[in-house]
């Protein structure tokens, strides 16, 4: 289930985002979380399986597009379709907008989708 990030989930969210290649530095990670907390165009969502939060996906709304800035799944929960479930939940949430990965999320995005979906475009 996709849930909206809350401050009480900060450490869990930071842990999940730290799996992103550009989020290894603690100061950068703290700034990323702060950006999601303060920028109204950015939203961070977490994926909950049973009682565990096992995934994170962060977006930035840009007119008719929603850019996927971050996407990460806990390594012990990978290869279970969680990335695809997060994408499907976002597509449902942002029905009138196009989901677009950025350079850092494109590879993961494509793997989660399995193939290019006509509702989704890709940045090159």
UniProtKB/Swiss-Prot annotation:
Gene source species: Bacillus subtilis (strain 168)
Domain N-acetyltransferase, residue spans: 3-124
Gene: ribT
Annotated EC: 2.3.1.-
Annotated GO biological process: riboflavin biosynthetic process
Stated role: Involved in riboflavin biosynthesis.
Pfam families membership: Acetyltransf_1
Identification of the protein by name: Protein RibT
GO molecular function list: acyltransferase activity, transferring groups other than amino-acyl groups
Keywords, comma-separated and alphabetical: Acyltransferase, Riboflavin biosynthesis, Transferase
Gene3D superfamilies, A to Z: 3.40.630.30
The UniProt record lists the keyword Chloroplast: no
